Amino acid sequence: MSKTANEAMEKRKAEGKLFADTPEWMIKGMIAKTLVGRFNRSWSINIPKRVILEKMIFGSFGKSWIEPPINIAVGKNISIGDGCYFNFNTVLLDDDKITIEDNVMFGPNVTVVTTGHPIYPEYRATGAMYCAPVTIKKGAWICSNVTILPGVTIGENSVVASGSVVTKDIPANVVAMGTPCEVVREINEHDKIYYFKDRKYEDGKLD
């Protein structure tokens, strides 16, 4: 594909139109996946090596921690703040921007997707795809086996329960669950007293 054709696809992608993959993007993806492979094989105690790889892989990466393995598409479209924790098997398909703000927690097997394909099979057969960015606001907790789809924003401090498929925005300070994911309640005073079922916070203080 020529430089002009590649630029045309970049323009279509930026405008939210259907686009197709390009050789240049494929090469960038292969380089990113090679770096991620090195990260996934690194020793947990070799923190300096991991810090170097994180800077090479991601667009920006704060003081956060990833439990390998992790998988990405591009890497440079991902922005991660401070105080975040990612449990095992995180998947970040970042053909568009993924923004993860400070103090976000991921359980195991969380998938964030920015790319989709047409439902109509003849269009899909051409390799056409579309993108929409995903934002996860500060303090959110994404529990295990959650899938977040293109164009979604998760609000500050919200909790998305295990096994949910998030197809639309979730507001701040709520608990949401289900397939498709829906808000079930707000985070409230009860949550200040009980941290799990009948277990009171005063029994679980860390000091």
Task: Kindly give the residue locations of the regions a language model identified.
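Terminal amphipathic alpha-helical/low-complexity segments used for targeting or macromolecular assembly
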Residues: 1-63, 181-185, 189-207
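Structural detector of well-ordered beta-strand residues that form the stable sheet scaffold
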Residues: 65, 113, 175-177
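Short-chain dehydrogenase/reductase
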Residues: 141, 159, 175-177
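A contiguous, mid-protein "functional segment" used to position or interact
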Residues: 165, 171-187
